[in-house]
């Protein structure tokens, strides 16, 4: 139905009364945020705090990429609906102490630093690496949202493997 759907239609779909929606959420905006707002720390970001471990970095990157890709595949459409409903960026960010993308990037940078300390990757600009990873995942999810299909047409699992492989070679410790 999209962001313009009436609370009457929402209530009917949920098999509850319209007043029950307003009693619980107060406003349609609050309902939209409760239904669509991502968590302040998504599960994939929390998982970064436990790693990396001693497994090959390509395996660990695949896990990170797979989890983050699934998150962005859900979040990009939800954020589009939130923004299309007229909720401003400022209203959206007021829900968080620190903006979730900032938390995600900081946590990914810390994970990459620990990967370097463990000898799994070489020293690089970790902010650039984190931005590249996040950008590759967000852009793919955005393209699917906009055009309905991934830019390369490759299945998600192939994209995860290809991105992990590319990153592994780019981040590989220098030999010699």
Question: In which residue ranges do the predicted regions lie?
Answer:
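Amphipathic C-terminal alpha-helical segment
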Residues: 70-71, 105, 110, 114, ...
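Helix-turn-helix
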Residues: 1-30, 34
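Short alpha-helical scaffolding segments that buttress acidic/His motifs in well-ordered protein cores
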Residues: 32-36, 65, 79-83, 133-137, ...
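Amphipathic alpha-helical packing segments from all-alpha helical-bundle domains
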Residues: 73-74, 81, 90-118, 127-131, ...
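Alpha-helical DNA-recognition elements
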Residues: 27, 38, 114
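Conserved hydrophobic residue
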Residues: 4, 120-121
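Helix-loop "lid/cap" segments that line or gate small-molecule binding pockets
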Residues: 50, 65-73, 79-88, 166-171
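Amphipathic alpha-helical linker/stalk segments
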Residues: 35-64, 73-74, 104
């Amino acid at each position: 139905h999209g962001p313009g759907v009436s609370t009457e239609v929402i209530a009917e779909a949920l098999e509850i009364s319209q007043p029950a929606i307003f009693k619980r959420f107060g406003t349609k905006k609050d309902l939209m945020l409760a239904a669509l707002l991502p968590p302040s720390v998504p599960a994939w970001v929390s998982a970064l705090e436990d790693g990396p471990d001693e497994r090959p970095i390509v395996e660990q990157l695949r896990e990170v990429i797979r989890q983050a890709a699934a998150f962005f595949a859900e979040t990009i459409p939800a954020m589009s609906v939130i923004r299309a409903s007229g909720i401003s960026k400022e209203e959206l960010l007021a829900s968080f102490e620190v903006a979730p993308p900032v938390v995600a990037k900081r946590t990914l940078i810390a994970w990459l630093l620990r990967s370097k300390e463990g000898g799994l990757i070489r020293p690089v600009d970790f902010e650039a690496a984190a931005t590249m990873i996040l950008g590759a995942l967000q852009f793919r999810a955005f393209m699917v949202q906009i055009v309905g299909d991934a830019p390369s047409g490759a299945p998600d699992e192939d994209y995860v493997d290809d991105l992990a492989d590319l990153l592994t070679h780019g981040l590989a410790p220098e030999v010699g």
